[in-house]
């Protein structure tokens, strides 16, 4: 933000200043990731067959086939893990809405609210601060009121944010909506992952988290595609498009209702017990 604000006095054009922020972002990523690569020990041991497969094209196709079969196996088992299935649907729905906020909030701010580039960068900066506060604060709230209830509250905050953004005709209202988005963004993602950990059998945690991530990646496509389709059909009616985005969050609230954490935890524990029994028999 300082580069964008002060870069003009250094003779930099706006394009050069924005490009410079990308370099700063890359540096921040490198610094943040360095401790992981330097100090975090890898406990999992890769399968020798998988390492060998990476050295040839046929081996890569074999690994891809195995991965696809494992995804199909996870899908078939969702009938038993119905609480995880409902949670995955909930995550897909609310992440579709979040993907719109992340990728298209700058477009909405510029087209509807008349934000300049500097205004938009300031918006992103402050929203990230409120996202950090939301993730930290709601972490304590989750421990006090429960993960499902905390996630439900954040989804309602998302719905309120959409209503404010769609109705905003002045900047203070839009800024309020943006900061609500920041508070809900960090907390909804952390609450979702916490519930996945509860509903996942320990012996299949990587499989379940992979399926959860796949649902979120699919949402990153569906959400912006839905927003873009509405603006294209309605000749750039961004307010209607953001209202449609709100339907994702409203549907996520409904998908969260059937999730029963105690039942899901019990099924996960039974699966682990059965897995240990099978292992001991061998």
Please identify what each model-predicted range represents.
Residues 2-27, 229-249:
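A membrane-interface helix-boundary motif in multi-pass transporters
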Residues 28-39, 243-275, 281:
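Multi-pass alpha-helical transporter architecture, strongest
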Residues 42-87, 281-282:
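Juxtamembrane intracellular "pre-TM" segments in multi-pass secondary transporters
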Residues 103-120:
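Short amphipathic helix-loop junctions that connect adjacent transmembrane helices
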Residues 133-147, 231:
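Helix-to-loop junctions at the C-terminal end of transmembrane segments
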Residues 149-164:
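Structural signature of the two symmetry-related core transmembrane helices
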Residues 166-178:
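Helix-loop junctions at membrane interfaces in 12-TM secondary transporters
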Residues 187-201:
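Intracellular juxtamembrane helix-capping segments at the cytosolic ends
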């Amino acid at each position: 933000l300082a580069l964008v604000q002060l870069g003009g006095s250094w003779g930099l054009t706006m394009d050069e200043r924005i490009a410079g922020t990308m370099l700063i972002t890359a540096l921040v990523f490198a610094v943040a990731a360095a401790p992981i690569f330097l100090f975090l020990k890898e406990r999992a041991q890769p399968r020798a067959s998988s390492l060998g497969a990476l050295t040839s094209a046929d081996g890569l196709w074999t690994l891809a086939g195995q991965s696809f079969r494992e995804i199909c196996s996870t899908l078939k088992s969702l009938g038993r893990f119905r609480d995880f299935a409902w949670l995955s649907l909930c995550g897909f729905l609310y992440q579709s809405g979040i993907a719109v906020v992340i990728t298209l909030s700058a477009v909405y701010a510029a087209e509807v609210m008349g934000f300049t580039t500097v205004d938009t960068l300031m918006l992103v900066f402050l929203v990230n601060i409120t996202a950090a506060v939301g993730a930290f604060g709601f972490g304590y709230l989750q421990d006090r009121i429960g993960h499902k209830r905390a996630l439900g509250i954040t989804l309602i905050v998302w719905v309120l944010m959409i209503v404010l953004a769609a109705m905003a005709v002045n900047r203070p209202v839009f800024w309020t909506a943006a900061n609500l988005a920041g508070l809900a963004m960090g907390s909804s993602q952390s609450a979702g992952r916490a519930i996945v950990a509860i509903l996942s059998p320990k012996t299949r945690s990587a499989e379940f988290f992979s399926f959860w991530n796949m649902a979120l990646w699919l949402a990153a496509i569906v959400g912006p595609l839905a927003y873009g389709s509405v603006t294209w059909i309605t000749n750039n009616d961004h307010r209607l498009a953001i209202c449609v985005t709100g339907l994702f969050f409203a549907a996520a609230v409904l998908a969260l209702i059937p999730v029963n954490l105690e039942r899901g935890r019990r099924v996960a524990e039974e699966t682990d017990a059965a897995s240990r029994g099978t292992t001991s028999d061998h």
